[in-house]
Each structure stands twice: as C-alpha cells, then as structure tokens.
C-alpha cells in the first residue's frame, strides 16, 4: 500500500509525469510519483510505502 505526499522539491504546476516521478524517486527517496490534480492546479505527488 502506498501513501501519497505532495512533493517537497517540485515548484509550480506539474505537466510532466516522467519528470515528477524521477524527481520524487531521486530527490525525495519515494517509490513513485505522478502529476495529480489538487485544486487549483496539477501538483507533483510522491508515493511512499506506508
């Protein structure tokens, strides 16, 4: 099971799933990452093992 947490290193609107995922894994030691709509814009969200 994965828990999601907004990226702490991504700035601005998320428009590239691949870059978001790479940044979550590389910089934040997450297992996965993707762009997800959180009002008012798409944000980079990182996924960790709970």
UniProtKB/Swiss-Prot annotation:
Superkingdom of origin: Eukaryota
InterPro entries recorded: Defensin_plant, Scorpion_toxin-like, Scorpion_toxin-like_sf
Record has Disulfide bond as a keyword: yes
Cell location: Secreted
Main location: secreted
Keywords: Antibiotic, Antimicrobial, Disulfide bond, Fungicide, Plant defense, Secreted
UniProt tissue specificity: Detected in seeds (at protein level).
Biological process, per Gene Ontology: defense response to bacterium; defense response to fungus; killing of cells of another organism
Disulfide bond sites: 3-50, 14-35, 20-44, 24-46
Matching SUPFAM superfamilies: Scorpion toxin-like
One Gene Ontology CC term in the entry: extracellular region
Keyword Chaperone in annotation: no
Family: Belongs to the DEFL family.
Function: Antimicrobial peptide with antifungal activity.
Protein name, entry field: Defensin D4
Organism: Nigella sativa (Black cumin)
